[in-house]
């Protein structure tokens, strides 16, 4: 896999899960002899929802909810075949979305 790069994008609602997953990926890649750039934290997306808790009137009675989506990017430069095999066998947490692209 000469002159290739693997870009891994991670998304999760819990920042502890995403940090743990990135740490596992970095350790696995370094153990197999690849060079790792990152993890690079991307901006956190905050979605806010406002809900009326009153059944009829009284617009002052509201609840506000927020969902935060944390994102990280990792670049693995010049991966070996052992690196790709190790990353495929890696078991990450259930709440983390992983996108892998070759470039």
From Swiss-Prot:
It comes from the Bacteria. Keywords: Ribonucleoprotein, Ribosomal protein. One of its GO terms (biological process) is translation. Pfam families: Ribosomal_S10. GO terms for cellular component: ribonucleoprotein complex; ribosome. The keyword Transcription regulation does not apply. The keyword Nuclease does not apply. GO terms for molecular function: structural constituent of ribosome; tRNA binding. Gene3D superfamilies: Ribosomal protein S10 domain. Belongs to the universal ribosomal protein uS10 family. Involved in the binding of tRNA to the ribosomes. Part of the 30S ribosomal subunit. This is Small ribosomal subunit protein uS10. The lineage of its organism: Bacteria, Pseudomonadati, Pseudomonadota, Gammaproteobacteria, Pseudomonadales.
């Amino acid at each position: 896999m000469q002159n290739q790069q693997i870009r891994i994008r991670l998304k999760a609602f819990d920042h502890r899960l995403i940090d743990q997953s990135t740490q596992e990926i970095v350790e696995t890649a370094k153990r197999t002899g690849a060079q790792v750039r990152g993890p690079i934290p991307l901006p956190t997306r905050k979605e806010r929802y406002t809900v009326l808790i009153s059944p009829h009137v009284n617009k002052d009675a509201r609840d506000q909810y927020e969902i935060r989506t944390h994102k990280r990017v990792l670049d693995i430069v010049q991966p070996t075949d052992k690196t790709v095999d190790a990353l495929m066998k890696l078991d990450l947490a259930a709440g983390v979305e992983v996108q892998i692209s070759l470039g």
